[in-house]
Amino acid sequence: MNAFQELDIHDMTKVQAITAIDACLRRAGAGVYRIRVIHGYHGGTVLRDAVRARYASHPKVKRIELGLTPGETDLVLREL
């Protein structure tokens, strides 16, 4: 498994996106240290805001980092 994973939630609803990210976090093995969530930004900030708010205090997430573009958010994972 890669140490870095990418998840594209562009065309998802907020509920679908949260479900997909939660599943990705559950599947993330010991070698995964970062999940890049691609939420986009041209269609609004609902997904971006939901990702950043929900996962800022998630037990598996060490910190949130801004991605390389405004349409990405990186979840840096804790070593559990």
Please state what every model-predicted region is.
Residues 1-80:
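Long, charged, low-complexity intrinsically disordered regions
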